[in-house]
UniProtKB/Swiss-Prot annotation:
UniProt keyword RNA-binding present: no
UniProt keyword annotation of Methyltransferase present: no
Signal peptide: 1-22
Keywords: Signal
InterPro entries, per database record: LCL2
GO biological process: ERAD pathway
Protein name: Long chronological lifespan protein 2
Annotated function: Probable component of the endoplasmic reticulum-associated degradation (ERAD) pathway.
Source species: Vanderwaltozyma polyspora (strain ATCC 22028 / DSM 70294 / BCRC 21397 / CBS 2163 / NBRC 10782 / NRRL Y-8283 / UCD 57-17)
Family indicated by similarity: Belongs to the LCL2 family.
Length: 143
């Protein structure tokens, strides 16, 4: 009885052996792909991503915003990547962060959030808007 079980077990292992080799050989395949990539790479083409190519070939005389590729005077002038759904919030150190606009049904509040000239100064109690972000930055995000 034990011999029959052992024989079936051995047969099952032998049957699954080719599949297990492919399953457990991830590292070898990864090294092989890396070697092929380096062998096929043309040094003249370089290793730049399309984003890097656009950034390096841009003729911006000022500052090129990394998220939007807009040409502006200074980093603080960069727009948010999605201005229709984001607020640009100023931080105490002069930098900024883009956050999602708070969801509200109040049209007056929505108009204030949509006003790009002043939306970074808005603070409504109980709402995580730019005022809340600024407050948390001053406190050190401890709460």
């Amino acid at each position: 009885m034990i011999a029959g079980f052992f024989t079936r077990f051995l047969f099952a292992i032998l049957l699954l052996l080719p599949y297990s080799q492919g399953f457990f050989n991830f590292q070898g395949n990864q090294r092989q792909q890396q070697q092929q990539h380096h062998q096929n790479a043309n040094p003249a083409e370089g290793f730049l991503s399309p984003h890097e190519e656009r950034a390096l070939s841009n003729q911006c005389p000022g500052y090129l915003c990394p998220d939007t590729e807009e040409c502006v005077d200074s980093p603080s002038s960069c727009p948010c990547p999605f201005p229709g759904s984001q607020l640009k919030c100023s931080l105490p150190d002069g930098t900024f962060v883009c956050i999602s606009k708070p969801a509200t049904d109040n049209e007056d509040i929505n108009r204030k959030y949509d006003d790009l000239s002043g939306n970074s100064k808005i603070k409504f109690n109980g709402v995580r808007d730019c005022g809340w972000v600024y407050e948390m930055a001053v406190k050190g995000f401890s709460t």
